[in-house]
């Protein structure tokens, strides 16, 4: 038995250099001539570090964004993915602890007219897997990377949702302004047509001029209807983001919008590294790396320490005769 244990320990030390225990290291080296000039490496308050409430100050837009963060189905799904990954990570951490099983049993027997005999037992078994070849360690690191990836994915969905609601809202404001101008133009052309018709009745204009003015007036009327249809379509898109029935959304005007003027763009490399979709892709690669290590570890033996203990009484209901037993096994099975 001692020889087997020593052999397994020596084997684990030998196989430690086979990539099972290696740590994920992202590639960070870049060519020296990648950038044309030097840049200031001081940290700056970039646009990506601003809270969305500081960027979008319109109260109507803020209300729509808050509603979207509560009701959007894609964002809710991303939040559930985070909870799922958190549970998987907790399960991977608990795999390092011993496992216990309790299975109480009881029997009642009677022969002829004798008094009934009661028997009961309370066995307890425990097992503990030794992570010699790093299977559980790599599985935990993989679960940790997937948990971080789910957090980054949730942040990416959140960013896309906020940007989508804001873009749709400002599109509505732009269409509102165009509709106001088109209606003013419609009224102006209506008066022009009436004036031209009066001139024709006075003999100062012909019918061709009136027809030309009317054609332009009807064209402006058609543009008003097109803008109203576009507004309805954009409101339907906004309702889809908010997961609610389409309606007429209360909103401000384009002239009342205010945006912060004092903010730095930031360093492009840092802005790229701060993007949640980029971080999510990096975490996915890290999880695949540790998943590969865990798969390699499955080719080596798994060592499990197991033991059992129990208390039993099978003599009679008035006599206690506890018997305890415990044993230790060291199986070595090769998992393929």
Language-model segments: residues:
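A small-residue-enriched
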Residues: 18-36, 66-131, 163, 233-249, ...
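Sec-dependent bacterial lipoprotein signal peptides
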Residues: 2-16
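Hydrophobic membrane-targeting signal helices
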Residues: 14-20, 195
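N-terminal alpha-helical segment
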Residues: 7, 48, 61, 192, ...
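Periplasmic alpha-helical coiled-coil/stalk elements that build and connect Gram-negative outer-membrane
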Residues: 136, 145, 152-267
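Short, polar/flexible loop-turn hinges at active-site or ligand-entry regions and domain interfaces
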Residues: 132-140
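N-terminal targeting signals for Sec/Tat export/insertion, comprising classic cleavable signal peptides
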Residues: 35-44
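Regulatory alphaC helix of protein kinase catalytic domains
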Residues: 43-67
């Amino acid at each position: 038995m001692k020889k087997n244990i020593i052999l397994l320990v020596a084997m684990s030390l030998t196989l430690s250099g086979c990539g099972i225990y290696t740590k994920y290291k992202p590639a960070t080296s870049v060519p020296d001539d990648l950038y044309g000039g030097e840049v200031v490496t001081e940290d700056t308050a970039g646009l990506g570090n601003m809270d969305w409430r500081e960027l979008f100050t319109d109260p109507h837009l803020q209300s729509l964004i808050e509603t979207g963060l509560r009701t959007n189905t894609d964002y809710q799904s991303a939040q559930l993915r985070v909870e799922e990954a958190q549970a998987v990570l907790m399960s991977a951490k608990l795999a390092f602890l011993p496992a216990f099983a309790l299975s109480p049993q009881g029997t009642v027997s009677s022969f002829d007219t004798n008094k009934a005999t009661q028997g009961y037992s309370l066995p307890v078994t425990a097992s503990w897997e030794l992570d010699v070849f790093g299977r559980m360690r790599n599985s935990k690191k993989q679960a940790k990377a997937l948990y971080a990836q789910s957090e980054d994915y949730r942040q990416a969905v959140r960013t896309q949702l906020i940007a989508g609601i804001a873009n749709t809202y400002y599109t509505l404001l732009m269409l509102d302004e165009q509709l106001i101008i088109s209606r003013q133009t419609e009224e102006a052309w209506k008066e022009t047509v009436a004036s031209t018709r009066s001139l024709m009745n006075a003999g100062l204009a012909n019918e061709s001029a009136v027809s030309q003015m009317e054609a332009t007036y009807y064209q402006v009327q058609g543009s008003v209807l097109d803008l109203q249809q576009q507004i309805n379509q954009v409101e339907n898109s906004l309702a889809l983001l908010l997961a609610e029935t389409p309606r007429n959304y209360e909103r401000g005007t384009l002239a009342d919008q205010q945006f912060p003027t004092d903010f730095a763009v930031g360093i492009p490399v840092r802005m790229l590294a701060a993007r949640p979709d980029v971080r999510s892709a990096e975490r996915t690669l890290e999880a695949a790396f540790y998943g590969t290590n865990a798969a390699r570890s499955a080719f080596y033996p798994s060592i499990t320490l197991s033991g059992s203990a129990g208390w039993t009484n099978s003599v009679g209901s008035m006599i206690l005769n506890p018997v305890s037993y415990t044993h230790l096994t060291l199986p070595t099975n090769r998992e393929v």
